[in-house]
Amino acid sequence: MKPTKYLLSLLLSGALPCAGAPFVPAPHAPLAPTSGEKAADSTVVSSPRQLNEATVTAHAEATRLKYAPQALTLLSARQIDGSASSLNEVLGRVAGVTIRSMGGVGSSSRISVRGLEGKRMGLYIDGTSAGQISNFVSLDDIPTDMIERVEVYKGIVPYRFGGTAMGGAVNVVLKDYPPRYLDASYEVGSYNTHRANSVFKRSFADLGLELGLGGLFVASDNDYEMTLHNLNDLRVRRGNDAFRKAVLGGSIKETKWWFDELKSEFILTSTRQGIQGIDWDYRSAHNHASSFLVSLEAKRKNFFVEGLDFDFSTAYNIGRYGLCDTARVRHAWDGRTYPTLSPLGGETGPFASDGHHRSHDWIGKLNLEYTLRPDHALNLNLYGTGTWQQPHNELMDRSLGYPGNFDSRLTALTTGLSYEAFFFDRRLQTAVTAKHFLIGSRAKMLHNFYLRDIKTIHINRSEWGANFAACYRITPLWTVKGSVASEVRIPTSEELLGNSFNILPSPDLLPERNKSVNAGVLYRRSFSDDRVWEAEVNVYMSELTDMVRFTPDLLPTMARYTNFGQVRTMGIEAEIKADVTRWCYLYANGTWQDLRDRRRTFPNSKAPNPTYDLRIPNIPYLMANFGGELHWADLFGRRQNTRLLLDASYVHRYSYDFEMGAYLEKLIPTSLTFDAAIEQSFANRRWTLTLKVKNLADRETVSEFNRPLPGRTCSVKLRYLLR
């Protein structure tokens, strides 16, 4: 059984095929892999253990995905249950993927795939979008214990996911659970960091009823020391970066009614996060958020018509959030105090803030798949979203002298029609997709916070996109893949409407359009003793027009999204991983990517652009990861497992501004970090004890516009599993 699509630690439901997988042919049709391959292989198995039926099914699904036409990296339980404490740390070791964080545990972070980042990335849990509610829950909230595998799509996003993701997607597939299951863990680490999560499931087979309950709690002071290079290398300790988050959820599922599966879920969240200053020593400013989500899902095969599969899901989330900044003085790092810019307070900017905003978010997805013949299928996907923001910040309005926050609405509908087919004894797989996008928004905005210039904007847009992907198995060991796409991404609610405290509305943003091509080759060899060797190389090129970028506003501490222009991307990535022996696993990957500004002139003018053909700033262009694992069974006694893990990450220095003139010195230095872990399990993995050390050499690392990151950290984790 799987937890909720929106936060895995919480809700438990029945096993289902991954939404991004190729369609499953009729029972008499042969399934890939072809002869000479095994459906389950060691690249998707964690440490040696007995596999139940659900696990074998999940492994067969992962093997099918390796031969899907999309460019794809699979992260197995072996790679997830390693030295990482969070999903972001796991994703940061994937070829072509970078994670840019602003600080320690719980800090703002962005996932970048092949240089395309942030809102372009599709974020999914069991095939259902989590991006619409990312202000309240994120992929990084998902405990790694609960993840079966992670699918990182590069380029084309599978049609079944729906939505407007462009250039890449991350889909987290949750573990299947037996009828009775209890999983609880607790981790304590440096800087007073605590992580606790648990999940419980109980099934009543005679009634077809399944109940699930779960939750998590994460807290950290994040009070590590950092060097402020902008203040003559001053060494200070962070004092306002504490993070607290709690989540509780439950689910109920029925499998003996007319629908094959009918499921309802709920999630409660609460978050408080301090705002750490760099130029100034912030003491009390913080963000807060809470939300309540309910969802409903229904599935049925042969929906009134033989061969037609019905999959419907919908969710509604109501959230409250805001920035609290009421400090009456500002603090410099040398201890001196200064008056705030506003007589009403505010240490982070020119205005005081006590936001109590409300947002309503709705998501709905309908997927209809019709199997025309055993090797041919037609798929219709409808994906709709709606957002209604109700900002409320009386203190900020008083600071301005007039209202500066207004209600706004945004609706979007994406319609996708896909055709998937196999040829030549299933050696050739093709998928073609056409999409239509509709978006409508109503909003008011201030063009200038210093002038009461309120403008009402109504927008209705319609766009088309399409893509084609194919893969061909030359031999049982060699597979080639390729794809071409002309895709559109509709700006998100945050990009268009802002967030009512530090991101200003930009309702006149244009949709992004991306033209891309990808080609790759995969070598995969399975051995009779369950070992696997795998190597893959991909080359890619894309051209993004009307690129949306997050840029500072003329108003201090405020920012907005703007259309940047034209960006060309080209790159190559390679990965190799191998079970060298039954007790030794090694991997390595590398990425070179080149993103260039292709605007010949400034927007709306004929003036030449001085940054033409320069590298886009704040995006790494040369990266590598490598590591390995040693594992033994019964090394220190019967029914025990031992694992030793080492992971390394290299990022070559890069600039956080255009490399021209005085900005040549705005460099983020090269980083090489090592993480290690020792894991010992007892009683057939009922008890597991793990010791983790990150950044072994205690190197200084920075990211995201030269923001300092933590040095060496240590943690210990205890997990109890009853099944």
Q: Where do the protein language model's features map onto the residues?
A:
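Conserved C-terminal beta-signal and adjacent last beta-strands/turns
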Residues: D241-T255, T269-T271, C471, G482, ...
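Gram-negative outer-membrane beta-barrel transporters
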Residues: F424, E534-A535, Y540-E543, T562-S655
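N-terminal periplasmic "start-of-domain" segments of outer-membrane beta-barrel proteins
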Residues: R49-D81, R110
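Face-selective signature of the C-terminal outer-membrane beta-barrel domain
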Residues: I252-S270, A289-Y450, K455-I457, S462-E463, ...
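Short acidic/polar hinge/loop motifs at secondary-structure boundaries
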Residues: T128-G155
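Extracytoplasmic beta-strand/coil segments of soluble accessory domains associated
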Residues: L72, N88-S129
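Periplasmic-side early beta-strands and strand-to-turn transitions of outer-membrane beta-barrels
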Residues: P179, E187, F204-A285
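Membrane-embedded beta-barrel scaffold of Gram-negative outer-membrane proteins
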Residues: R473, K481-A485, E512-M570, T591, ...
